[in-house]
């Protein structure tokens, strides 16, 4: 019995001692979803005085992929509604990280991010678009044409992706996440601007893979020792 108690305490200690990892490259990202040879990073920056300020997930894909597609693949639950009418649900989808929920409003020109919530059981973080600020969209890596306000000439953004954060030069996106096509090594950041005041994207910490609950681990330990005792009886 003492052995079981000791092992259980070690399990609890191990869960609580997991350190946060600053993302220097894709190799530091812990939570990945999707499949394919290409890799991209999703960064959420809350700017809510909580820690960490900025968090990163990874997304694997092949063929064609978009910024909004990556966001929906990561979010555990996504709800798409009519603008200003949360009761009219147009679409729902399920992603990989059950700690994150996402609300998107669908306009004629495309989908617009409204709110993101993240709850890991320790802290709960929620930011909503157009109420106390807005989600600014920044990116790195890609190839697309765009127009600037008042400029009749089309401009081109053509920057190769990189798995290294030291290579990232954030660019305020002139296109929406629905139109943004990912490239291998691309980074997308949604940074909340409280009071509609923008701020620079800071180097993110890796979002951890959710651990099995303590109860499940302790149950496994108990079953293991019960079977061992029977075998030795």
Residue ranges of each PLM-predicted region?
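Sec/Tat signal peptide C-region and signal peptidase I cleavage site
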Residues: 15-19
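Short, charged juxtamembrane terminal tails flanking transmembrane helices
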Residues: 230-233
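Sec-dependent N-terminal signal peptides
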Residues: 4-13, 218-222
């Amino acid at each position: 019995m003492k052995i079981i108690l000791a092992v259980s305490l070690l399990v609890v200690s191990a869960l609580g001692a997991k350190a946060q990892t600053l993302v220097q490259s894709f190799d530091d990202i812990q939570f990945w979803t999707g499949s394919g040879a290409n890799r991209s990073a999703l960064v959420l920056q809350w700017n809510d005085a909580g820690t960490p300020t900025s968090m990163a997930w990874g997304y694997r894909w092949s063929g064609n992929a978009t910024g909004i597609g990556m966001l929906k693949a990561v979010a555990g639950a996504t709800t798409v509604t009519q603008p200003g009418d949360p009761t009219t649900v147009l679409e729902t989808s399920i992603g990989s990280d059950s700690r994150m929920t996402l609300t998107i409003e669908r306009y004629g020109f495309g989908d617009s991010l409204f709110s993101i919530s993240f709850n890991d059981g320790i802290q709960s973080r929620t930011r909503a678009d157009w109420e106390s600020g807005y989600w600014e969209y920044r990116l790195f890596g890609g190839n697309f044409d765009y127009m600037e306000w008042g400029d009749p000439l089309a401009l081109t953004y053509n920057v190769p992706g990189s798995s290294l954060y030291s290579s990232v030069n954030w660019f305020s996106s002139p296109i929406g996440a629905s139109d943004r096509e990912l490239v291998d090594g691309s980074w997308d950041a949604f940074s909340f601007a409280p009071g509609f005041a923008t701020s620079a994207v800071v180097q993110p910490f890796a979002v951890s893979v959710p651990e099995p609950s303590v109860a499940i681990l302790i149950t496994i330990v108990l079953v293991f020792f019960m079977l061992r005792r029977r075998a030795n009886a």
